[in-house]
A protein has these predicted regions:
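PAPS-dependent sulfotransferase catalytic domain
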Residues: 2-153, 163-193, 266, 272-279, ...
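Helix N-terminus capping/helix-initiation residues
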Residues: 95, 154-155, 230, 246
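Acidic, glycine-rich loop-and-strand cores that form catalytic or ligand-binding grooves
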Residues: 153-159, 202
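Short, flexible loop/turn segments with low-complexity composition
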Residues: 219-227, 275-284
């Protein structure tokens, strides 16, 4: 994507959102309506997050402004400045829904600390995310920066090892990736939703979210039971063009005992900090 293409798409976005705001009588709504921002890591269930946000727009006065995420890097352009990313965030008004892949650096943490923001962060088991990234690079993204290196490795065990440790100049190790997002877990405006809960405990997870949004000033148009049915129907991970498997714990079929040892050595207490294990004694 060229920078000109990106700017043209942005101009179309402004026109589209203006129409949606008018259609929902945007300026007659309560001034305490939050701005909802969904945040995730790549290959951590972000399509499920997008479906959830779209479902919320259907049952509330929130406006899903753009299905395209806010990114810190763009294809064929490369890294974007934090100022460019902040401008994208600044276009979101109260009552808007946006989403993106934003690491937890002070610039973004501070920008979204304002009381008008409601940050919905989607987390996923690092082991499942790692496997998902490998299959995505090999099967679905011919231009993925990690693909050539993965293809040079003869076994899945070695590919997992490389993903755990990282490859200098190509990809971060899994610990570094999660460290760069960990600040969202303790951010004052953030509510964390686990991808696993959206798959295995969806009713409970959606109920908790809808009730919390209500306390934040976002009311549903319909009774809660109907709202929850609507949200449940909106979520179908298999409809994602990059879908492979939404089954939590699928890493167990791919890791070897060696990979488990390498993961523990490389990540320390990462799984405990993210709530995926209670201690370091986990195994296949």
């Amino acid at each position: 994507m060229s920078r000109l293409t990106h700017e043209l798409r942005r101009a179309k976005w402004e026109l589209r959102v203006a129409g949606r705001r008018t259609a929902k009588r945007r300026f007659r709504r309560r001034p305490d309506m939050p701005t909802l921002f969904g945040c995730a890591m790549a290959k951590s269930g972000s399509h499920a997050l997008s479906q959830l946000l779209e479902g919320l727009a259907a049952i509330t006065d929130l406006i899903y402004t753009d299905m395209h995420p806010i990114r810190t890097r763009l294809p064929q352009i490369g890294a974007r400045s934090s100022e460019e990313v902040l401008r994208d965030l600044g276009r979101l008004r109260r009552g808007d829904i946006g989403w993106g892949y934003l690491p937890a650096i002070p610039t973004y943490l501070d920008a979204l600390a304002d009381p008008r923001w409601y940050v919905l962060f989607l987390s996923r088991d690092p082991r499942d995310k790692l496997i998902s990234e490998i299959h995505y690079a090999l099967r679905m993204h011919p231009k993925h920066g990690f693909r050539e290196h993965l293809l040079s490795l003869p076994t899945m065990e070695e590919r997992i090892s490389a993903s755990i440790s990282g490859v200098p100049g190509i990809i971060k190790g899994i610990a570094g990736i999660y460290e760069s997002y960990q600040g969202w877990l303790s951010h004052p405006r953030t509510r964390v939703v686990r991808f696993e809960d959206l798959i295995l405990e969806r009713g409970r997870a959606l109920t908790t979210l809808v009730e919390d949004l209500g306390r934040a000033g976002v009311q549903t148009h319909v009774p809660q039971a109907e709202a929850l049915r609507s949200l449940d129907a909106a979520m179908s991970p298999s409809k994602s063009p990059t879908f492979r498997s939404a089954r939590p714990g699928g890493w167990r079929a791919e890791f070897t005992a060696r990979n488990v040892m390498e993961f523990k050595q490389a990540t320390g207490d990462l799984l405990q900090r993210w709530g995926y294990e209670t201690d370091k004694d986990w195994a296949l």
